[in-house]
């Protein structure tokens, strides 16, 4: 499978990245199939070879999360609503439990009201 990912280069603690197409089993700084762009996180500079990127995407290349974000900012991919990774499963589970408790309390209160109305009749 072909992946679109970042290849690190530059000085120590002053990293820059090249956006490359490479085999998914190859090393991070291994020889890429094709260089498709450049990204400098310090200056936020991004250069994309749009034609080559479109060709690779139509061939079925899968971008990594960071490259996907760069392509979305560059307008090559549509922005998709993705659930935040920061929200843990435990937090989601707590929210579900809290919602279920609220529903149960509402159901109990409505049953109590209907029971009292029937008793009065």
UniProtKB/Swiss-Prot annotation:
Which GO terms are recorded in the biological process aspect for this UniProt protein? translation
Q: Name the family.
A: Belongs to the bacterial ribosomal protein bS16 family.
Positions with biased composition (Basic and acidic residues): 100-114
- Tell me which positions the record assigns to the signal sequence: none
- What is the name of this protein? Small ribosomal subunit protein bS16
Residue span of region Disordered: 100-121
Q: Does the keyword Nucleus apply?
A: no
Record's superkingdom?
A: Bacteria
Could you tell me which PANTHER family the record lists for this protein? 30S RIBOSOMAL PROTEIN S16, SMALL RIBOSOMAL SUBUNIT PROTEIN BS16M
Q: Which UniProt keywords apply?
A: Ribonucleoprotein, Ribosomal protein
Gene Ontology terms: cellular component:
cytoplasm; small ribosomal subunit
User: Which Gene3D superfamilies does the UniProt record give?
Assistant: 3.30.1320.10
One MF annotation (Gene Ontology) recorded for this entry: structural constituent of ribosome
């Amino acid at each position: 499978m072909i992946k679109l990912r970042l290849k690190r280069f530059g000085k120590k603690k002053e990293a820059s990245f090249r956006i490359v197409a490479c085999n998914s089993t190859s090393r991070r700084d291994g020889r890429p199939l094709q260089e498709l762009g450049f990204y400098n996180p310090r200056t936020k500079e991004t250069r994309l070879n749009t034609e080559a990127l479109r060709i690779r995407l139509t061939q079925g290349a899968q971008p990594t999360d960071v490259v996907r974000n760069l392509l979305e900012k560059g307008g090559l991919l549509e922005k998709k609503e993705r659930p935040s990774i920061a929200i843990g499963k435990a937090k989601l589970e707590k929210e579900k439990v809290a919602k279920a408790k609220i529903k149960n309390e509402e159901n109990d209160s409505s049953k109590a009201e209907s029971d009292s109305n029937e008793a009065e009749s």
